[in-house]
């Protein structure tokens, strides 16, 4: 007769073997989760079993549903949570490859405080609220379009979409990357009615906030805000086409200044970043009439530069290419005794300086009035630069000499032209409006020598 200990040992070995086999092949695993006041919606007739607990003793309870309804079971309930773990290494690799090719949607749980959401039409919300380390679902019926706010800790799902794996032919296409940036006092302008959802944070806890915008307006969210920022990734260098190309690019960089001053000739909206104690946040300024805008303190404002890069292949174009760059550059100018004529009522904001200290000064002018300020004034000086570029090349095979790009940057009143001189052929560059240059008399001298030789 077999001993009981051997039977127990055999059962244990079989149990361990079966559990390891299940884990290896990635079967579905069901885990028990204890909740309070279990709530679920049954869309059709069904029968399910849950475990209810009283005084640390749990027993199964069968619930029969004959029609579509919402079931609420009070007390402590143990309900199943189903998860599918990954299988073996080869199965994981194949699944990962297929998900990269086709893309997938991953849903995770995020705990937030004071959950807020907007329901545009009648519906029923089911969320999970937590208190004293115990979580239970809460059902909220919504009859009309409204904004629902649930106070306290709430567990809400967050969905993330993974993009499909790009093939080699699609690797050169641009990719849009969205990242999260934490700012203080978030400001944005909404030209059309819309709904904004941002995450506001307090004491290291963040929760979403929905803002309804019905008319064109500027929205300011005080405090710490997590907002998305979008950037475009350029294609890889290896996938660039080899045919002749001309690239026109505009590069915008941030320049840090103190007491930023600019003149707006027409109604517009200016967005700059003001900084205080190593923290920067965007500031939106609405300009309704032609005026001078002064932003005191440390300001990061955009600075734009334009570049043209022309590459030549084995067969250059028959006719030269003519390109024109035009840019408006605004620089501060210091004047003593500022005078200007205001044909219409307006408000002028100037920066006056005294004893090496400058501060904004506001002057209100009526229509048809000449305003004079006998002091040292810092005013913006705007000028337009226009550079016309002609690029032509001789017929030189690309295999003998790689093409050297010609870069022209129009960022100041004196156009700066920088060229790299190749050893074989130098592209001919002419700039309209530039000073006259001396022509190298090599060709004329050779012609003169030939004439003298023919005479003597």
Swiss-Prot record:
Glycosylation-annotated residues: 27
Propeptide stretches in the record: 434-456
Lipid-bearing positions (GPI-anchor amidated glycine): 433
GO cellular component: extracellular region; fungal-type cell wall; side of membrane
Keywords from the UniProt entry: Cell wall, Cell wall biogenesis/degradation, Glycoprotein, GPI-anchor, Lipoprotein, Membrane, Secreted, Signal, Virulence
Record's comment on post-translational modification: The GPI-anchor is attached to the protein in the endoplasmic reticulum and serves to target the protein to the cell surface. There, the glucosamine-inositol phospholipid moiety is cleaved off and the GPI-modified mannoprotein is covalently attached via its lipidless GPI glycan remnant to the 1,6-beta-glucan of the outer cell wall layer.
Coiled coil: none
Localisation: Secreted, Cell wall; Membrane
UniProt note: phenotype after gene disruption: leads to increased sensitivity to Congo red, Calcofluor white, and zymolyase, delayed filamentation, a higher surface hydrophobicity, increased adherence and flocculation; as well as to a diminished ability of protoplasts to recover their cell wall.
Entry's induction text: Induced by caspofungin, tunicamycin, during chlamydospore formation and during cell wall regeneration following protoplasting. Repressed by NRG1 and TUP1. Also regulated by TSA1.
GO biological process terms held by the UniProt record: filamentous growth; filamentous growth of a population of unicellular organisms; fungal-type cell wall organization; negative regulation of flocculation
Signal peptide: 1-23
Membrane association type: Lipid-anchor; GPI-anchor
Function: Cell wall protein which contributes to cell wall synthesis and is important for acquiring normal surface properties. Required for virulence in a mouse infection model.
Protein name according to UniProt: GPI-anchored protein 13
Organism field: Candida albicans (strain SC5314 / ATCC MYA-2876) (Yeast)
Gene assigned in the entry: PGA13
